[in-house]
Regions:
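N-terminal export leaders
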Residues: 1-2
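Thiol/selenol-based redox catalytic cores and closely related redox-interacting motifs
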Residues: 62, 68-140
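N-terminal, post-signal-peptide region of Sec/Tat-exported proteins
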Residues: 35-78, 83
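Compact recognition or signaling/catalytic modules
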Residues: 6-8
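Local sequence-structure signature of Cys/Sec-based thiol-disulfide redox active-site neighborhoods
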Residues: 17-44
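N-terminal signal peptide c-region/cleavage motif recognized by signal peptidases
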Residues: 11-13
């Protein structure tokens, strides 16, 4: 009986630790790199619900993404907005540290970023989405 209780408690704790791994990814219906980014997250253990929309700008503004930080797609995960092709290390850092910001963004569609083809030409600057003006959250 004790072994069953321990196993059940351990299973429930493990599930709670990974509850932030549920993501909703909003994208333009015709965009293929967004699907590649969703697959990148899935390979890392995230459950990703891809939501095609023709109102992507509306989604971005509703979640307080400034136009200067617009990325290819908008992902909602763990109570944060993740804009664009943000690398997994930075995404996981956000979800672990839980800073008091709205989210993070890798603006544009930089070559070599997760889900994009091509060669990375230099470090990526990932910015905070917050009330502060364009603070760098991470460089990868």
């Amino acid at each position: 009986m004790t072994a069953v209780a321990i196993a059940l408690t351990t299973s429930m704790s493990a599930r709670a630790d990974h509850s932030f791994k549920h993501a909703a990814l909003y994208k333009n219906p015709s965009c293929g790199c967004c699907e590649e980014y969703a697959n990148y997250l899935r390979r890392a253990g995230y459950e990703v619900n891809v939501i095609p929309t023709h109102d992507l700008d509306k989604i971005k503004r509703e979640h307080k993404v400034p136009e200067a930080l617009d990325g290819c797609h908008t992902t909602l995960v763990g109570g944060y907005v993740v804009e664009g092709h943000v690398p997994l290390n930075t995404l996981n850092r956000l979800l672990t540290e839980k800073p008091k910001i709205t989210g993070i963004s890798l603006p544009g569609m930089p070559l070599g970023s997760p889900g994009m083809g091509g060669q990375k030409s230099g470090p990526f600057k990932i910015y905070e989405i917050s009330n502060r003006s364009q603070q760098v959250y991470a460089t990868e």
